Structures are given as structure tokens and as C-alpha cells.
């Protein structure tokens, strides 16, 4: 009887230790996955941010179009355009549009948001990008915090939300000074135009803004 109790105790201890080991392995695997996700997200943000900084030149002959043309392909590569497009007009409106209307809007939205970012940095020289860190965001997203430092001026806080799209982390929103969501800002801005002119009216309005951006230099 005594031997049986010892055997049972040993078996119970073995089961507990096995459970602890499995939990430990699960936590380790999750930690490794989290580190890989953070590293991948950081790489995306750093690539775009460095491209944004590089688009600003001290050479006065560099035009808005030069900066725009340099940044647009990097924007398209690293931003989740489908998420951005749907979020900036709202799910109900988005689902009412045809595939071709959605595609046309994504194309002009990419150019409009790129142009907006180019204009934000056009008047300041001496930009320097600093990566602050990454933290978990809502709905399995990640938030990457960065600074755009400027000569003799306060740095600009730029935070990026990233979501996984097709197994790859992509930027789905930008927050200026940790508060102003680019998606929320554009949705509020576009809503009136959509109500009065629909998809075609919004396309025309954005094309007009892009023309004004280029004319302003």
C-alpha cells in the first residue's frame, strides 16, 4: 500500500512537471512569435520613415513632385490600402461600391495620402527619424511609436498602427502627436463629399486637392 501511494505521488508530480513544461514551452513559443512580429513591424515602419525623411532635401531645387514620386512607391508597398480605403469611407459605403470603384478610390487615396505626408514635411529641413518602440494595439494590431526630430524645433510624434494582411505586417493608420488618427480625420473630411457626390464626387475632389498640392510646390 505504501509503495502504491509513493508511485501515485511520483506520477502526480510527473504530470505536474509535464504540464509546467508544456506551459513554459507555449510561453516561449509565443514570446518568440511576438519578437518576430515586432521585428517585422519595426522594419516596415523604419523603411517608410527613412524614406519620408529622405524625401526632404536641403537642395532648394527639389520640388514637391520629386518628393512625391520618391515616396509613393514606398507608401504603396508598406500601407494596407484596402484597410485604409474601407475605413476612410465606412463599411456601408465601401460595400455599396463596385470592385472598379473600390480600386479607383484606392489608387487616388494612395496618391492623396502620400501627397499629404510630403506637404507636412516640405517646410522643415534637418529631419531625423528615431524609433521609440512597439506595443500591442487593438484587435491584434501593433502600435509603433516614432519621432521626427527637427533642427531647433520640437520633435513630431508619429505613431503607426500595423495590421497583418496576408501574413505580412502593413501600416493601417498614422497618428500625429499620439492622438490624431489619419483614418478618422479623412473619414470626417470625406463624408460630406460622399453624401453629395458619391464615389465619383470624392475622386474629383481628391484629384483637385492633388493638383493644388503640386501647384503649391
Regions found by a protein language model. Give the residues of each.
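Bacterial N-terminal signal peptides
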Residues: 14-25
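Boundary at the C-terminal end of the N-terminal hydrophobic targeting segment
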Residues: 28-35
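Surface-exposed, polar/charged faces of alpha-helical domains
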Residues: 36-43, 54, 58-62, 66, ...
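Short beta-strand edge/turn micro-motifs at domain boundaries
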Residues: 155-185
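Low-complexity, intrinsically disordered terminal/linker segments enriched in charged
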Residues: 175-217
Amino acid at each position: 500500500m505504501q509503495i502504491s501511494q509513493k508511485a501515485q505521488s511520483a506520477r502526480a508530480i510527473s504530470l505536474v512537471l509535464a504540464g509546467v513544461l508544456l506551459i513554459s514551452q507555449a510561453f516561449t513559443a509565443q514570446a518568440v512569435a511576438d519578437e518576430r512580429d515586432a521585428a517585422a513591424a519595426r522594419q516596415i515602419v523604419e523603411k517608410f520613415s527613412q524614406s519620408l525623411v529622405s524625401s526632404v532635401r536641403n537642395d532648394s531645387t527639389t520640388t514637391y513632385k520629386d518628393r512625391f514620386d520618391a515616396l509613393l512607391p514606398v507608401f504603396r508597398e508598406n500601407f494596407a490600402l484596402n484597410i485604409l480605403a474601407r475605413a476612410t469611407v465606412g463599411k456601408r459605403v465601401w460595400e455599396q461600391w463596385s470592385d472598379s470603384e473600390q480600386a479607383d478610390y484606392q489608387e487616388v487615396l494612395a496618391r492623396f495620402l502620400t501627397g499629404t505626408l510630403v506637404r507636412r514635411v516640405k517646410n522643415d529641413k534637418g529631419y531625423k527619424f528615431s524609433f521609440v518602440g512597439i506595443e500591442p494595439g487593438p484587435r491584434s494590431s501593433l502600435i509603433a511609436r516614432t519621432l521626427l526630430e527637427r533642427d531647433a524645433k520640437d520633435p513630431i510624434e508619429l505613431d503607426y498602427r500595423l495590421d497583418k494582411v496576408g501574413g505580412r505586417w502593413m501600416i493601417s493608420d498614422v497618428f500625429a502627436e499620439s492622438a490624431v488618427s489619419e483614418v478618422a480625420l479623412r473619414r470626417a473630411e470625406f463624408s460630406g463629399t460622399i453624401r453629395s457626390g458619391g464615389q465619383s464626387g470624392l475622386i474629383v475632389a481628391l484629384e483637385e486637392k492633388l493638383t493644388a498640392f503640386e501647384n503649391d510646390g
